[in-house]
Amino acid sequence: MDMKAMLKQAQKMQADLEKKQSELAKKEFNISKQGVEIVINGAKEITKLVIHPALIDEDDKETLEDLLILAFNEAISLISEEEAKIAPKANSLGF
């Protein structure tokens, strides 16, 4: 394969990757954990947070904090999995 063809292939792959990243940024992920619901987009921006009223207890805020951490971490993990699916494979360029 000559250099021009390799460069053209690399440019196409870059354009495809940018398109997929843009699509991922617009995608929404919904996570619900024991009364805590989070909606987060692929750009890792939280767009909605719902906390069931029963979880709001001034004497036990640690439980709510733990549930929020669990939900946030699961949301970020889902996005990372999607990012891994669209990441280019190093050997796909033929190197």
Swiss-Prot record:
Listed Pfam families: YbaB_DNA_bd (PF02575)
UniProt cross-references to InterPro entries, sorted A to Z: YbaB-like_sf, YbaB/EbfC
Record keywords, A-Z: Cytoplasm, DNA-binding
Localization annotation: Cytoplasm, Nucleoid
Cellular component, GO annotation: bacterial nucleoid; cytosol
PANTHER family found in the cross-reference section: NUCLEOID-ASSOCIATED PROTEIN YBAB (PTHR33449:SF1)
Assembly and oligomerization: Homodimer.
Purpose of the protein: Binds to DNA and alters its conformation. May be involved in regulation of gene expression, nucleoid organization and DNA protection.
Name of the protein described by the UniProt record: Nucleoid-associated protein MMOB0740
Organism: Mycoplasma mobile (strain ATCC 43663 / 163K / NCTC 11711)
Organism taxonomic ancestry: Bacteria, Bacillati, Mycoplasmatota, Mycoplasmoidales, Metamycoplasmataceae
